[in-house]
Amino acid sequence: MSKFEMGQLVATPAALEALEESRQTPIDLLRRHRRGDWGDLSPSDRQSNEEALEDGSRIFSAYILKTGVKLWVITEAQDDSGVRASTCILLPEEY
């Protein structure tokens, strides 16, 4: 079940390379993110995401790949019309 719309889906080249090396797909992470499985986050970050579902602010997830590499998935805050423009998969150091 989807908790929110993700907008345009993008990923950095380094994130795609990390996914390929771990034999995982972007879709796996995006499905988890969209249904509210926030991955490897602190309780306070999880709570911030739950609040973001209500107030339209940024949504953030972190996942550890099979290779041990961490990836972030970030969905931008809603604009004035209530639309979330994009979701990006990236390495933490690319933020």
Place the predicted regions along the sequence by residue:
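Short, compact, well-ordered microdomains
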Residues: I59-Y95
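Compact soluble domain cores
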Residues: M1-F60
